[in-house]
């Protein structure tokens, strides 16, 4: 009788304790990992929503404290003080992570640029980087070369990300498309709780934009597009959902900027503009987003630069909600244009306005069914967890 292989003990290191897209991917993997021979401990730099959600899912969590100054550094910060803060922060966080690793840990599975570098400073473990982002353009080939030198394996969330990181003969990331929990994210009857919370007439149609409040997520472009389209969509309201959950220096003040922009939104000519702020609404970050999507008629996802994957796009499709998405990056691999949604040229508010008008006039019933079928065909959280676990076991065996 063959023996059941012992589970592989893995430390899943995340630079963020918030609950954005990549953190939800980690949460869904960790909650399923034991089914596929992985014993995970998620290591975070501080307590937060992710730690709470992991605890609810029964996943072990360890806090390896990192300084707030280090965590606030973003890809756009630069200069000698920032470099020193980064080096010191990485050194200290690597020590803290090492102190929290459970006995028997074999693999460091990192999520986020700072997590990748911190894990590289901990000798004696196999390392696998999960690439949720494109390498920063201004650094040229540095990050892909670092990945080739400092990791034993890399996972990319999309073909677009894999292509951006690939270095001939040195680095070929394995593509594992993200998934979602198809039991949570599923079509449901509308309850009108969003309409009621925002005091919007139940007869109104809603375009939803769930996204972290960050400049590159494109909320300002979506507001401009809605201004252009609003006169032809008199019964449509725009709902911007989210919050400033990542406290990096580059994004401070953006939420206030967005609120000011919406307060100035108007439709009509320059001579006689009519305020639109009664048709553009804010809804705070929703920790249970599967309750949110069924309340929308359409979801818009319009980042200003290519999205590495686009989890919001997938969540909406899984709930049977058609999507308007920028025609770049990961959404190209998720949305079947004309079947489960529409792909729109990026950074073009006029094109997005036209797409809003066309979508609002379309029969959405066939797209709703196609959206759900698309999610079911390739994007389950179980499939994702199984593929990631297989790679972790391979790396742990020394074959990665």
Annotated model-derived regions:
Residues 294-308, 321:
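Acidic donor-binding loop of glycosyltransferase active sites
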Residues 327, 336-338, 342-349, 357-362:
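Conserved acidic donor-binding segment of nucleotide-sugar-dependent glycosyltransferases
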Residues 186-200, 368, 372:
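A short helix/loop element that forms part of the nucleotide-sugar donor recognition site in Leloir-type
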């Amino acid at each position: 009788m063959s023996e059941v292989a012992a589970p592989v003990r893995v430390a899943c290191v995340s630079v963020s304790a918030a609950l954005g897209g990549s953190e939800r991917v980690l949460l869904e993997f960790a909650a399923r990992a034991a089914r596929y021979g992985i014993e995970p401990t998620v290591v975070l730099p501080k307590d937060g929503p992710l730690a709470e959600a992991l605890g609810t899912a029964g996943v072990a969590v360890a806090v390896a404290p990192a300084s707030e100054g280090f965590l606030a550094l973003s890809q756009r910060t630069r200069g000698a003080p920032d470099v020193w803060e980064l080096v010191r922060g990485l050194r200290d966080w690597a020590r803290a992570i090492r102190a929290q690793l459970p006995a028997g840990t074999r693999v460091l599975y990192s999520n986020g640029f700072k997590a990748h570098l911190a894990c590289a400073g901990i000798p004696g473990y196999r390392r696998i980087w999960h690439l949720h982002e494109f390498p920063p353009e201004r650094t040229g080939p540095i990050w892909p070369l670092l990945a080739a030198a400092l990791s034993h394996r890399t996972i990319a969330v999309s073909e677009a990300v894999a292509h951006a990181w690939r270095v001939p003969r040195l680095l070929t990331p394995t593509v594992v498309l993200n998934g979602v929990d198809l039991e949570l994210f599923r079509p449901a009857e509308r309850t009108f709780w969003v309409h009621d919370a925002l005091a919007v007439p139940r007869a109104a149609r809603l375009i939803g934009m769930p996204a972290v409040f960050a400049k590159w997520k494109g909320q300002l472009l979506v507001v401009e597009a809605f201004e252009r389209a609003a006169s032809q969509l008199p019964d449509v309201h725009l709902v911007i959902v989210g919050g400033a959950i990542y406290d990096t220096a580059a994004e401070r003040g953006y939420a206030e900027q967005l609120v000011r922009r919406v307060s100035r939104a108007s439709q009509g000519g320059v001579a006689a503009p009519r305020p639109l702020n009664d048709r553009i609404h804010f809804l705070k970050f929703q920790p249970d987003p599967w309750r949110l999507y069924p309340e929308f008629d359409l979801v818009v996802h319009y980042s200003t630069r290519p999205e590495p994957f686009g989890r919001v796009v997938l969540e909406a499709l899984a709930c049977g909600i058609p999507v308007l998405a920028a025609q770049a990056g990961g959404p190209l691999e998720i949305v079947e244009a004309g079947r489960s949604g529409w792909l729109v040229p990026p950074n073009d508010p006029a094109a997005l306005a036209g797409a809003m008008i066309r979508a609002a006039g379309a029969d959405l019933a066939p797209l709703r069914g196609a959206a759900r079928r698309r999610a079911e065909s390739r994007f389950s959280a179980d499939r994702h967890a199984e593929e990631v676990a297989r790679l972790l076991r391979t790396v742990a065996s020394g074959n990665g």
